[in-house]
């Protein structure tokens, strides 16, 4: 479906209701909320209604794992919310309840929206204020940041079947495989494919620094293990994860200094594959159903006697 979204002229998104049977508000028999108005003398005051970004983020559609690639990969999106219609492409966004001439929204050559207007909602997150997925103009590090930011956002979504954890993201992972600084992944943990294996290993080690955002001791909200997927990957857990991404330093350096001496994987046959072998033969890991599930790290050991605490 990733190729379908990327090449479609327009994606119609139903961000209203709780299931696929709800329909599109304002179309046929599906009602939508009326725009409130008041007249004071000869002045008519209209409600601008709830901002569509808020409506989209709080919709059932935004909680579903399979719709993430629809949001991220589509070139043009026409979104139906409970109140109004919202449009967003990779250059601008506008919505029905506020009428602004398009000439005033755009820069002089009409190539993009003026920077003073609010950025779009798709692809935008706490680490990337403007979510345009123009990956070919980015450095190898910035592509890595965008990849991990996408993982963070996707991990907060829900899936009916645990084994869909990576399948529902396959359109996005293939997008990152085709850019100038190409990235592959092992169980959802990315590394650059266009560099020597030692540097690729450093990036992979940084991918391993993900953490749960929910308290593991909270009996209700704690992360849940996904059967059949490795525990060392975010894909092996249901629940939002976070990565310590540095996006505002202006320095394209990895934030985690890798002291790992070696990274390898153990297959079901007990055969050991070095990380360099995985990089040299990417077909080994692209079919994740048969990928090695055991991760082996060789690292320096810090003895417990090196730590002290105030009792």
Regions found by a protein language model. Name each.
Residues 1-311:
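Feature captures the RNA virus RNA-dependent RNA polymerase
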